[in-house]
Amino acid sequence: MASLEIIKLEWATPIFKVVEHSQDGLYILLQGQISWQNSSQTYDLDEGNMLFLRRGSYAVRCGTKEPCQLLWIPLPGSFLSTFLHRFGSLLSEIRRDNATPKPLLIFNISPILSQSIQNLCAILERSDFPSVLTQLRIEELLLLLAFSSQGALFLSALRHLGNRPEERLQKFMEENYLQGWKLSKFAREFGMGLTTFKELFGTVYGISPRAWISERRILYAHQLLLNGKMSIVDIAMEAGFSSQSYFTQSYRRRFGCTPSQARLTKIATTG
């Protein structure tokens, strides 16, 4: 089993920035407050919360003046497959939830979870310990989450992660969301009929293809807006919007301000 690269992060971002994840994993908020957004919901985390997320792009903002401190635990497919196989008999005792897995799940950290996290952090500080100890601590953490009040939802998400058609769809959409195709063209290029494509998409993302594509383009445009000097009209075209006015309307609906206002806020914040 490959070693897992666990990272301790410190973020200071008072305005929403886009965070892209090519892997599924867990965030543990060690200090501060933070908000995560996907296309349909905002998730507010307080110190002591844990967040499970599926691969994808999200908008993130810190809610405190002090930097937020987080621990990122990636969960690659090979690790999860081994985990599910190893503890399959034990996990089969947990009620199955057949609902579409949520892209984000928030867990409140109980005393026993807190102790498990402390033990994991202690091992991470010891370079002389073998990596297998880290893996064992992560497995312990996953088991505790599986037997928590949201365990059925958590396991449902884990079981979907190793699904090859779903992984292929995620890769395909990340590579092609800027294409100006009709939905039937997306389905055809993926190698499916339109109805089957929509059904698979709903299973993976929990929203319609059009809503996901629109959200992904808005996040891409948001990155260009805050991290470059392109004009707003050029950003609109680059991100696949039919006009600047449509982009401005979509941006205001998503972030609560116009692109021009967001850029001015970024300049004022960074000096």
From Swiss-Prot:
Xref: InterPro entries: AraC_XylS_family_regulators, ExsA-like_N, Homeodomain-like_sf, HTH-like, HTH_AraC, HTH_AraC-typ_CS, Tscrpt_reg_AraC-type_HTH
Consequence when changing G228C: In plasmid pYVa127/90
Entry keywords, A to Z: Activator, DNA-binding, Plasmid, Transcription, Transcription regulation, Virulence
Induction behaviour: By increase in temperature.
Cystines in this chain: none
Domain HTH araC/xylS-type intervals: 167-265
GO MF terms held by the record: DNA-binding transcription factor activity; sequence-specific DNA binding
DNA-binding region extent: 184-205, 232-255
Coiled coil spans: none
Keyword DNA-binding included in the entry's annotation: yes
Known role: Transcriptional activator of the Yersinia virulence regulon.
PANTHER family, alphabetized: ARAC SUBFAMILY, HTH-TYPE TRANSCRIPTIONAL ACTIVATOR RHAS-RELATED
Protein name per its UniProtKB record: Virulence regulon transcriptional activator VirF
Species in which this protein is naturally found: Yersinia enterocolitica
Gene: virF
